[in-house]
Structure formats: C-alpha cells, structure tokens
Design a protein with these regions (language model features):
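Conserved nucleotide-sugar donor-binding catalytic segment
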Residues: 7, 17-101
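Generic helix N-cap/helix-start motif at coil->alpha-helix transitions
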Residues: 122-127
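Catalytic core of nucleotide-sugar-dependent glycosyltransferases
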Residues: 84-92, 96-121, 141-154
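Conserved donor NDP-sugar-binding/catalytic core segment of glycosyltransferases
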Residues: 1-14
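Residue-level recognition of tetratricopeptide repeat
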Residues: 157-158
Length: 168
C-alpha cells in the first residue's frame, strides 16, 4: 500500500497509509478503513479466496472496507511504503463524499463482522465520531454535533468525543 496525493478543489494533501499493524482485524473494526483501494496491489487469488468484493446495495461506498476486513481475517500481510505513487481526486458530489451514506454503509459492514456487543458499540461509536469529524471539517457543525452525540451514546468512555462535542 503506497501513499497518495488527495486533490481537492482548493488543496492537495499528502496521505500516507499504515503502519502494517493497522491492517489487523480489530484495528480495522475499531479505527475504521485505513487503506485506499487505489493504493494497493493484491494477488487476484487472495481476493477470490475471500469471495471478492460484496455487491450488497447497503454497503456501497464501503465495499473496499468490507474486503479489507475479510482479507485481514485471513492474516494477509501487507507492506506499506511512504512513497507517493498515486493521486486521488476528491469530488464534492461523489458517492464516497456523501458522509451520511458512507457512515451507514460502514455501519452495515461492521455489523456484518462483529457479534460481540461491546466491540460492536465501540466500532459503531468510532463510525459516528469519524462522521462528526468530517462534518466539522466541512463546516457543518450541527451535523457534526449530532454525529458526536450518536458516538457518545454508543461509547461513554471515549473522552475524545467530549472534546469534539465542545468544539462543534
């Protein structure tokens, strides 16, 4: 997995993925998707072994996240490099830029992989926290606040959520 430049309308951001430890199942579930589909090369057989990408309608925008989770369950080892070898163009109207749709898709992915309720609540809380941060970054403070509240309801012990609530 390599680094990328993310091109937005007004700025370019360098994004570096990894370290390898982030590709472990529990980290993927509790921290969210940390791998770019366009920044990875995997043997076709490995993808076929885990039943490829899901075509379920409810996880559109998070199909890659589901695939990474399935691959991590197989203890696949990824190599991460800090070299920037690609560019990702961000469009405001793209499917993956739709925060609420992507959050709901990620939630469906997580619910399909976690049975333990405590772990599930932590992972879902993180989904809403990520959504809140994205809304806040976009200047949508009301939506950010709502997302942080949903996050807090699922995990009262994450003190970072209280901080985000204060600033949103």
């Amino acid at each position: 997995c390599h680094g990328e430049y993310w091109n937005n309308e007004d700025k370019t951001t360098k994004v570096i993925y990894g370290p390898e430890d982030n590709f472990k199942l529990e980290k993927l579930l509790l921290r969210g998707n940390c791998i770019s589909l366009s920044a990875i090369v995997i043997k076709k057989e490995k993808i076929i072994d885990v039943d490829c990408f899901s075509t379920k309608q409810e996880i559109i925008t998070a199909e890659d996240y589901d695939l990474w989770i399935k691959l991590s369950k197989q203890n696949l080892k990824l190599h991460f490099t800090t070299k920037v070898l690609g560019t990702y163009q961000i469009h405001k109207n793209s499917e993956s830029s739709n925060i609420i749709r992507n959050t709901h898709a990620s939630i469906k992915v997580i619910e399909g992989h976690i049975k333990d309720q405590v772990l599930l609540n932590k992972a879902l809380s993180n989904c809403w926290k990520i959504a809140g941060k994205l809304y806040y970054k976009n200047g949508s403070n009301k939506d950010a606040f709502k997302s942080f509240m949903k996050s807090l309801r699922l995990n009262l012990y994450d003190i970072t959520i209280y901080f985000y609530l204060i600033i949103s």
